[in-house]
Amino acid sequence: MYLLSPRNGDEEDEQEEIQELISDDEPPNLKLASCATAASSSSSSGSDMEKGRGKACGGGSTAPPPPPPSSSGKSGGGGGSNIREAAASGGGGGVWGKYFSVESLLLLVCVTASLVILPLVLPPLPPPPSMLMLVPVAMLVLLLALAFMPTTTSSSSSAGGGGGGGRNGATTGHAPYL
């Protein structure tokens, strides 16, 4: 939320002045810790160095600068996006994680369990009439016909030369499907 909240420049200047006063009165090893907090607070606004306020920690200390704070646990909203990016990049799960979600696997388990359990529970039924067996076959034929139908239709002013030839009319010279 800190990034989304409006900043007030006067409060930052007061905080930096207080930080400078505190760092001048501290012993040298505590001064390094306050310099790290002053550096992290002054890094958010680039005009501090222009105003000459960045000199509180500029003493001749030979200690290396402290490492930047780790983002684990301290970032407000960015932690979840790193996990989602790792999952989306295919970092784990292989083929199963790429093509199947948890919901689809749960549905597959439920359907499989019902297909195994229902024949055990239901009483044996007589075989259906032979005409009733034609229904799934007709549905399969209809789905195959729909799968190979062209998806776009062209107008009579297409580049294939009048008559609404579409893809087949433009390339092979044959009449359209329908």
Curated annotation (Swiss-Prot):
Induction: By auxin (e.g. NAA) and cytokinin (e.g. 6-benzylaminopurine (6-BA)).
Superkingdom of the source species: Eukaryota
Positions of the UniProt region annotated as Disordered: 1-85, 153-178
Membrane-spanning parts: 105-125, 131-151
Gene Ontology cellular component terms for the protein in this record: cytoplasm; endoplasmic reticulum; membrane; nucleus
Residues covered by region (Organ Size Related (OSR) domain): 100-151
Gly residues: compositionally biased ranges: 159-168
BP terms from Gene Ontology: cellular response to auxin stimulus; cellular response to cytokinin stimulus; positive regulation of cell growth; positive regulation of cell population proliferation; positive regulation of organ growth
Low complexity composition-biased segments: 33-47, 169-178
Membrane topology listed for this record: Multi-pass membrane protein
Ranges annotated as biased composition (Acidic residues): 10-27
Keywords annotated in UniProt: Cytoplasm, Developmental protein, Endoplasmic reticulum, Membrane, Nucleus, Transmembrane, Transmembrane helix
Tissue spec: Mostly expressed in young tissues such as young roots, young leaves, and seeds. Also present in stems, mature leaves, and spikelets.
Subcellular location(s) per record: Membrane; Nucleus; Cytoplasm; Endoplasmic reticulum
PANTHER family referenced in this protein's UniProt entry, alphabetically: ARGOS-LIKE PROTEIN, PROTEIN AUXIN-REGULATED GENE INVOLVED IN ORGAN SIZE
Domain notes for this protein: The OSR domain is sufficient to promote organ growth.
Membership in a protein family: Belongs to the plant organ size related (OSR) protein family.
Function, as annotated: Promotes both cell expansion and proliferation-dependent organ growth.
Full protein name: Protein AUXIN-REGULATED GENE INVOLVED IN ORGAN SIZE
